[in-house]
């Protein structure tokens, strides 16, 4: 099993895979999980954020709430599950530094992690997080990376 999610799905699935407290509380068994792929996820709320993300965070978290309690980057524990983070420097919604922080944190605690920077011309948030699946892997470097990484895990 390889767990993956785009955007908010990357946020939630990364918590599922790398947050031991959530795993214990929800009785999550990761024995069959051999990889995680996050695509354009908001892994940290302390990085540069767009107005849209700020509005969403203000709706999700009460004023004064410690938002690090909801950050995959802050809650990540040591894990044997390797990680691929796919992020665009031209995302427009989620800043590239979000993925960079997650990548650095993973390496810092000894987790295997790779950060892939989207090179395709269609590199905005909606396009590469979902639209890449509308193309063939020969046409889309990001989709090819996604599929190659899965093939390497198997």
Task: Name the predicted role of every residue range.
Residues 100-104, 108-154:
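C-terminal catalytic histidine-bearing segment of alpha/beta-hydrolase fold enzymes
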Residues 32-34, 80-82, 111:
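Loop/turn elements at helix/coil->beta-strand transitions in domains of secreted/extracellular proteins
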Residues 79, 85-87, 91:
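Short beta-strand/loop motif that positions the catalytic acidic residue
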Residues 92-101:
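Conserved alpha/beta-hydrolase "acid-adjacent" motif
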Residues 1-51:
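Primarily recognizes the serine-hydrolase "nucleophile elbow" in alpha/beta-hydrolase
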Residues 1, 83, 112-114:
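Hydrophobic anchor at the start of a short beta-strand
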Residues 41-75:
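Mobile cap/lid helix-loop segments that gate and shape the active-site cleft of serine hydrolases
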Residues 6-7, 39-42, 87-89, 118-121:
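Active-site-proximal beta-strand/loop segments in catalytic clefts of secreted hydrolases
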């Amino acid at each position: 099993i390889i767990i993956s999610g785009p955007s908010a799905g990357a946020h939630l699935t990364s918590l599922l895979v790398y947050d031991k407290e959530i795993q214990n509380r929800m009785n999550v068994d990761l024995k069959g999980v051999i990889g995680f792929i996050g695509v354009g996820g908001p892994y940290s709320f302390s990085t540069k954020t767009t107005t849209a993300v700020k509005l969403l965070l203000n709706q999700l978290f009460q004023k004064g709430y410690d938002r690090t309690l909801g950050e995959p980057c802050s809650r990540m524990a040591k894990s044997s599950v390797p990680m691929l983070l796919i992020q665009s420097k031209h995302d427009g919604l989620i800043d590239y530094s979000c993925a960079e922080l997650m990548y650095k944190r993973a390496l810092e605690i000894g987790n295997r992690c790779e950060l892939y920077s989207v090179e395709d011309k269609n590199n905005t948030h909606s396009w590469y997080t979902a639209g890449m699946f509308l193309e063939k892997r020969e046409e889309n470097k990001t989709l090819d990376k996604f599929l190659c990484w899965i093939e390497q895990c198997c």
